[in-house]
Amino acid sequence: MFKKILSARGMGQVLSVFAALIVMIIVFALINPLFFSATNITNLLRQVAPILIIGVGQSFVLITAGIDLSIGSVAGMSCMISATLMTKFNMNPILTVLITIVCCLAIGLVNGLLISVAKLPAFIATLGTMIIARGVAQIVNGNMNTNGIYSDAFKNFFYYGRFLGIYTPIWIAIVLFAFFAFILSKTALGRHVYALGSNYEAARLSGVNVAAAQTKVYVISSFLAGVVGLILTAQ
């Protein structure tokens, strides 16, 4: 993957994206002088934090040459479960978070087992769990709008709070990015992930537990989607 990025064509594509981004930043700065204000920058970072978190999970999946179509529905399911538990059942926020994350991990585990053990194509397996997660979300909240998250601690921890002047979603994204970047670059699981993406059969023959590695990848993806759902709930 990195060889493709570092190739002349790959570098050209990367540089063109950065050039377009720089042009957009310059244009917005000229249109509105407050674009580079600290308030605007922190608000932008807070809004893109969920995308970064989702991107971390998808990086694991894509490196293994897989695909996870269920992440959007898992995030939505996380929203509905957490919101319903706190509004309809007045559940403690900590217990709510634990139950929500466990439900999301279950979806990731099912994805991993369907792909690594049942040998279903990742597209088909995650399409099925996408539909399941979406159905669970609708069943949990009765297909009705859920309003009134009254737990200030929950809202501050996942969205509105600040630490050192920076919104908590940004800190959550930074911590998760650093943690999973470490896993990907410094642990056996990270090496196995790259091995799977490079050559699945060679990885298996070299002694890598490919089923376990694949399952962990999809569990990580669903876990991070669940965290994003909690952030969106707090928002």
Predicted regions and their residues:
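Transmembrane alpha-helical segments of polytopic membrane transport and secretion proteins
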Residues: 1-15, 19, 36
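Transmembrane helix-bundle core of multi-pass membrane transporters
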Residues: 8-9, 123-187, 213-216, 235
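Hydrophobic alpha-helical transmembrane segments
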Residues: 14-19, 44, 52, 73-77, ...
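Structural signal for alpha-helical transmembrane segments and their membrane-water exit/capping regions
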Residues: 20-36, 137-141, 181-188
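Hydrophobic residues within the alpha-helical transmembrane core of Major Facilitator Superfamily
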Residues: 23-26, 81, 132, 178, ...
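Single transmembrane alpha-helix segments in multi-pass membrane proteins
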Residues: 24-89, 113-119
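Membrane-helix interface segments
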Residues: 69, 89-95, 122-123, 189
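Helix-loop-helix "hairpin" substructures at the membrane interface of multi-pass membrane proteins
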Residues: 92-97, 106-111, 115, 162-235
